[in-house]
Each structure stands twice: as structure tokens, then as C-alpha cells.
């Protein structure tokens, strides 16, 4: 059981506190990755968890809840949310990497 996801946008935090398109967007847009719905492990070109000390699923997702996973890299964390509760085959995701890619959004199947 896994999601296959494609990156649509990458955002970074601006000095004025707003979100802006990240310099990483050009290289990451259109990239894909897979997420284990059992372990929260992410494999692919972007936001991989290979070097994480641990990964875990916080919420498996349901008709009412999003799928949520977290990766602990020791000195930073990464979170991922997929709107599992939407009743359609393609579901939006958002990921936040503290000290990493920033905020990544897109679609999962």
C-alpha cells in the first residue's frame, strides 16, 4: 500500500513572513515519489526519508481524516499530509521540511 505523488509547487518562507515560490521549484516540479502507507517511508527524487533516523504514520487516513506521516532526521523533521478523506482517486498533498526543501505541494494517487 503506497501513494505515488507528483510535485506541483515548492514554496519557501520569505523574510516578510509570507510564502513565495522557492528556487527549488524549477528542478523539483514534476518530480515524483512514493510513500508507504504502512511506515511513512518516502522513496523518490524529492523529500526522501532514506537518511531519516525514523519514520512513522501519525494517522492512516480514513473517510474523515488525512493520512499523516513524520520523519525524524535528528536535527530536523519532515511532515507529510495527504487528503485521504476526499472521495476521488487523485488527492492533494502538502509536505513541510524544516531545513530542507520547504513546503512542497502536489497530487497523489
Describe the residue ranges of each PLM region:
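Short, solvent-exposed aromatic-acidic interface loops
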Residues: 10-12, 44-53, 97-101
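Extended Gly/Ser/Thr-rich low-complexity repeat segments
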Residues: 18-22, 78-92
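Short, surface-exposed coil-to-beta transition loops
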Residues: 28-29, 74-81, 100-104
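Contiguous, well-ordered beta-strand patches that form the walls/edges
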Residues: 38-78
Amino acid at each position: 500500500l503506497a501513494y505515488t505523488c507528483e510535485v506541483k509547487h515548492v514554496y519557501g518562507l520569505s523574510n516578510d513572513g509570507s510564502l513565495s515560490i522557492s528556487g527549488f521549484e524549477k528542478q523539483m516540479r514534476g518530480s515524483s515519489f512514493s510513500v508507504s502507507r504502512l511506515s511513512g517511508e518516502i522513496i523518490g527524487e524529492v523529500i526522501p526519508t532514506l537518511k531519516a533516523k525514523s519514520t512513522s504514520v501519525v494517522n492512516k487516513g480514513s473517510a474523515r481524516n488525512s493520512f499523516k506521516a513524520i520523519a525524524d532526521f535528528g536535527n530536523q523533521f519532515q511532515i507529510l499530509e495527504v487528503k485521504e478523506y476526499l472521495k476521488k482517486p487523485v488527492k492533494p498533498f502538502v509536505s513541510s521540511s524544516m531545513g530542507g526543501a520547504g513546503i512542497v505541494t502536489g497530487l497523489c494517487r
